[in-house]
Design a protein with these regions (language model features):
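Positively charged n-region of N-terminal signal peptides that target proteins for export
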Residues: 1-9
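A beta-rich soluble binding module of mature secreted/lumenal proteins
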Residues: 8, 96-100
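N-terminal export/targeting and maturation segments
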Residues: 22-97
């Protein structure tokens, strides 16, 4: 009986170790030709790793019609215990496409965002649309006013990101004041620490 308990405990520990090792690799995707594979557009109602906690990503373009307009792209997935996503897409639009996309984004029902994760009023770029959640993070679009639109997202839970996000995304693509580090003040406030 005692031996069975020890074997059971060892098996449980082995499984936990395997889960931790297998699920903790940061996955980086930068081939824009596979863009839709990493978006939640097609994973609604499914148990896909790309469902992104149900956050609405419709701010991002549903498809990219001209890959040559994309100047930068990166999507990161990390799941040490809970899934986390960090991504950005930078598109330099033609004048007509830019005007059309600006119109689409300005009609998006943006949410309040100021105060979540120390975010302040966006002043680095013009904020075109934002979907903010006090627990899950942000999906948004910014513009420099010169035909360039930056789509970005930081989606996570537990009030912090395990990803060293500043290593993977330009800080000017983050909303002004964004702080989702382990010891961020917003987390302390929400956890009553």
């Amino acid at each position: 009986m005692f031996m069975r308990i020890i074997i059971s405990v060892l098996l449980c520990l082995s499984c936990l170790t395997a889960m931790t090792c297998c699920g903790s690799k940061i996955e980086i995707y930068d081939d824009v030709s596979h863009y839709r594979e990493y978006m939640s557009f097609d994973s609604e109602g499914t148990d896909s790793k790309w469902n992104k906690w149900g956050m609405d990503e419709s701010i991002w373009p549903r498809q990219i019609s001209d890959v040559s307009q994309v100047s930068d792209y990166k999507m990161i997935y990390y799941n040490p215990w809970d899934a986390q996503y960090l991504g950005y897409l930078v598109i330099d639009y033609s004048d007509d496409d830019y005007a059309s996309e600006i119109d689409r984004l300005k009609n998006y029902p943006s949410t309040d965002y100021i105060g979540y994760y120390s975010v302040q009023k966006e002043e680095t770029y013009e904020l075109l649309a934002v979907n903010a959640h006090q627990y899950l993070g942000f999906v948004y679009a910014l513009t420099d006013g010169k035909n360039r639109i930056v789509y970005a997202e930081q989606i996570f839970c537990n009030y912090f990101m395990d990803i060293d996000y500043e290593k993977y995304i330009r800080t000017d693509y983050l909303l002004d004041g964004f702080n989702a580090k382990v010891d961020n003040p917003y987390r302390k406030q929400m956890m009553n620490e």
